[in-house]
Amino acid sequence: MIYQGENLSVDYIENGIAHLVFNAAGSVNKLNIATLRSLGEAIDVLYKQKDLQALLLSSGKSAFIVGADITEFLGLFDTPEEELSDWLHQANVIFSRLEDLPVPTLSAITGFALGGGCECVLATDFRLADDTASIGLPETQLGIMPGWGGSVRLPRLIGADPAMEVITTGKPKRAKDALKIGMVDGIVSRETLIDASVSMLKQAIDGQLNWQQRREQKKAPIQLSPLEAAMSFNVAKGMIMKMAGKHYPAPLTAVKSIEQSANMHRDDALAIENKHFVALTRTDVAKSLVGIFLNDQLVKSKAKQAVKNSEPVKNAAVLGAGIMGGGIAYQSASKGVPVLMKDIAQASLDLGMNEASKLLNKQLERGRLSGLKMAQVLSSITPSLNYGGIETKDVIVEAVVENPTIKAAVLAEVENEVNEHAILASNTSTIPISLLAKSLKRPENFCGMHFFNPVHRMPLVEVIRGEKTSQQTIDRVVAYASQMGKTPIVVNDCPGFFVNRVLFPYFAGFSLLLRDGGNYQQIDKVMEKEFGWPMGPAYLLDVVGIDTAHHAQAVMAQGFPERMAKNGRDVIDAMFEDDRYGQKNGIGFYAYALDKKGKPKKNIDEKTNAIIATITDSTQPYTSEQISARMMIPMINEVIRCLDEGIIASPAEADMALVYGLGFPPFKGGVFRYLDSIGLDTYLDMAKEFEQLSPVYQVPDSIKQKAAAGECYYPAPKSSVSSPSV
C-alpha cells in the first residue's frame, strides 16, 4: 500500500501502474474537504515514487464521485472572500499537480462523475467509462459555477461551444453522449473497465498514445480565432439571457469566465475562474439554491424514514374519476401500483381513462416508454361503477367534488367496504380532515392526501394529519406518495392546510390592491418578471379557476374570520358573478384561445377593466416595490403563523412546500430563506407601512421577537474552511 486515507487509497495494480481508489465510508464518494486533503496527500506520495509509470483513478462504489459535499457549501459561502479564494487556489493546486504528474493518467468512470468528480477526471489525460456513467458539471443549478478547473479544462478538451452547453445547463451527459463530444475516450462494460484502463495506460507508457499532447491541449489557450470567439460567446450569452433570465446569474457568469480566460494558459485561466466562482458565492441566489437542495434532502430523508416504518402499498383505489382522479390513477399505475378507479358515472370513468391514456401517449411520443409499457400501465387501471375488489386495497384516495357533505358521505360508505387495515385518504384542498373524520368509525386510519393540479407535473403532495390520525397511517400514505414519485410533506390539520392557507392571503392582497386602484396587468408583470413567480395572481386565478377560488375563499373566511373574512365585494366576487371562471370556460381576467399545440393562450380582454371598476373608485400608480410588498406581506405573515402553530414542522419544509406546491421563485429559496436574506428588521419596516390596510398585513409577534433577538429562521452556517491550506 502506497497510501491509505479515510476516503481513498493508493497501491500498485501492476508493475509501475499505481491505482488510486476512492472508497469513502458512506454509501457514495463525495469530494468533500477531507477527501480533497487526502487526495493532495496521496499525490504528494505519488511524486516520490521512483518506479511510477502510470496512474489509474477508479471508485470502490457503484458511482465514481457524486460531487462535492453540498452540506459544506453554505459554510464555504460564509467564508471571507480572500480566505475562500486562497483555499480555492490551494484546492486547484492539487488538481494541477494531478494533471502534471510525469506519467500518463486515466480515470475509470462508473456511475456518476459530477461536479468535483467531473473536474477530477478532467485533470487526468484519459477517461474510460462504463455504460452506466453519467458525467457533468451541475454547479450552475446551485447558483455557482465550476471552481476546480471545470470551466478551464472542459472547453480546452472538447471545444468552447459543447463545453458551455454542458456547464450552463448543468445537465449531465450519459456515457454515449459524453463519448460523442469527447468528454470520455471510450466505453466498455463494467466488468472489463479496470482491465481496459490498464491496457490503455500500457499503450500510453509504450508511446502508442500521445498522452503529453492531450495534456498540453488542456493547459494551452482555447483554439478559437477572434471571429469564432466573438460568435461563440455572443450566441451563448444571448441564449442564456433568454433561457435563464436575469434572476440566475451563474450560467452567464460561467460563460464570461470562459471568454475572459480563453486566450490564457491553465494557471492564469484558473485565477479567472477563481474570481468568478467566489463572486457567485456572495450572491443570495447561490445561498437560496443550495438551501433548496439541502431542504429537499431533509424532506426526502423524512419520507425515507416513513418508508422504512411501513409496508409498501401494493394495490390502491381512487374514488372519483374525471381529470383529477384520472391523473392520480395514472401517477400510481405508472409507478407500479395498480389502481381501481371508481365513480358513479360512466362518463367520468371515460374521462379519467382518457386522461391517463393522454398522459401515456405523450410519454410514448417522446420515446420515454414503449408501447408495451403503455399497455401494461393502462391495464393496471381498473375503471369500475361499483366497489367490487376494493376490499383488497391498501390505500383508498377519495377525490370526489370539493363538498364536505358529499365527501363525508362517500368516505363513510367506502369505509364499510374496505378491510379494517385499509387507509382512507381525502384529496381535499381546503376542508379540514378532522371534520371529515367525524363520519368515520376508524378515524385513526384516515388522513388528507392533497395532490396539486396537474397531478403528473406537480411534485408536492401534502399529507394532512387529523386530530385522530395515527402515525402508522401517516407513514403509509407518505410511503405511497413516495412510491408515486412525489415529494410528500406532512402538515397538521387546519382549513386550507398549509399551501392553500398561505395562498389565499396572497389573493387577498391582490384583491385589496385592485380595490385601491392597481392595474392587474402591471401586477402580473411585476410578480412574474420582477419577483419571479411563474404566473402573476390574475393569471394564476384563471388557471386555478375563479369559481374554485371563490368557493375556497369562503371556506378560508369561515376558518379564519378574523383575517380572511372579506369586507365587502371583491374582484373574485365580481369575476364569479360575470361567469368568468378562467381557462376552464375561456374567459377570466384574460381571454383564452387554443394555440396550434392545443394549449390555452392568454390574451387581453377589454371588459376586464370595466368589471374591476365596479369594485374600485379610481386607478392609482404603484411602483414595483409597492406591488411586491403588498402582494407578499399577507402570504409571508400567514407562513410565519403556520410555523408558530405547528401546522408545518420547520422552515425547511415550509420553503419546500412553497417551491414545489406554488412555484415560489427558487432563486429566493422560499419565504424563510427570503426573510433571512433581506433581514427580519427590513421586513418589519416594509410591513409597517401597510399594517392598517387589513389584518392580513399585521405581522405575528414571533417575528418581532426573533428580530429583536437578532435571530434568523435558518441556523447561521459555520465556515467550512479553517485555513487556506487543503
From Swiss-Prot:
The record marks E119, E139 as: Important for catalytic activity. The keyword NAD applies. The active site is at H450 (for 3-hydroxyacyl-coa dehydrogenase activity). Residues 311-726 are annotated as: 3-hydroxyacyl-CoA dehydrogenase. GO terms for biological process: fatty acid beta-oxidation. GO terms for cellular component: fatty acid beta-oxidation multienzyme complex. Keywords: Fatty acid metabolism, Isomerase, Lipid degradation, Lipid metabolism, Lyase, Multifunctional enzyme, NAD, Oxidoreductase. HAMAP family: FadB (MF_01621). In the N-terminal section; belongs to the enoyl-CoA hydratase/isomerase family. Involved in the aerobic and anaerobic degradation of long-chain fatty acids via beta-oxidation cycle. Catalyzes the formation of 3-oxoacyl-CoA from enoyl-CoA via L-3-hydroxyacyl-CoA. It can also use D-3-hydroxyacyl-CoA and cis-3-enoyl-CoA as substrate. This is Fatty acid oxidation complex subunit alpha.
